[in-house]
Amino acid sequence: QNADTLVSCGGIQSNHCRAVAWAAARNGLSCMLALRGEKPVEVEGNLLLDRILGADVRFFSVEDFKNIQDIENTVVDELRRNGNRPYWIPMGGSNATGSLGYIQMIREAAAFPVSFDHLYVALGSGGTFAGVWLGCHHAGIQPRIHGIAVCDDRAYFVAEISRIQREFQEVYGMKVDFEGIGQAIDDRHVGVGYALNTPSELEQLVHFASCEGLVLDPVYTLKAFLGMVDHIRSGAVEKGQNLLFVHTGGHPGLFPKHSEFNKMFLFR
């Protein structure tokens, strides 16, 4: 691509944007990030890492983010006027190229000496789910895939995932079976909203970490995990079946929640 600057967008605590900033620094490239929301008073969590990694950060309103194309045009045009060669990565890395990493992940999982009956993954922008679906198709394994939405609804994700998979088919020439995507998406666990948690949800995060030594992040994996637990309790998962839970990281997202955790621990 002959680019010298990586450009992407997302929420202020975007794990994807932090990964883009890291990739840019690691490969000697510049980085510009367009983040959704007002400039915060404190620089913490993923935003702190963005800045430490040298990213040029710009803030756009929630209203602006309703048209991502305008944001892309704004930042890319500015960089080009300044003599840079930008490479735009869509929000969440959710496109055909971004799916490749999860296809590889599924290939590795398929080599485990155990087969999986169910696979659980968080749904934020659709790229991870699309890659997992494509990976299972490519690897010839057939677990029942569950995408637990952390924002938006089933109709939104069906459209986004189908778009990514069509793009993958066009770019890489691999035929994909789209049947059943809608039934695989569970949008009942968004809760009070994207990146927002109830005290009960955070209590369950703490309980699971203290019992298992595995820390979830409050935005994505916590809600996916709670969705999985709900399926187990409701009988949707049968006793003795094997489950694969995809942990997508995101631990820096815990730190902007420090005031909520403080309240929890102070009153224990």
Give residue spans per PLM region.
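Active-site-proximal loop->helix
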Residues: R18-E63, A155-E167
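Glycine-rich phosphate/pyrophosphate-binding loop at beta-loop-alpha junctions
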Residues: S99-A184, V246-R268
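Small/polar-residue-rich loop-to-helix segments that shape phosphate-bearing ligand pockets
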Residues: G37-P113, I181-Q204
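Alpha-helix C-terminal capping segments
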Residues: Q1-N2, A19-S30, W133-G140, G227-A236
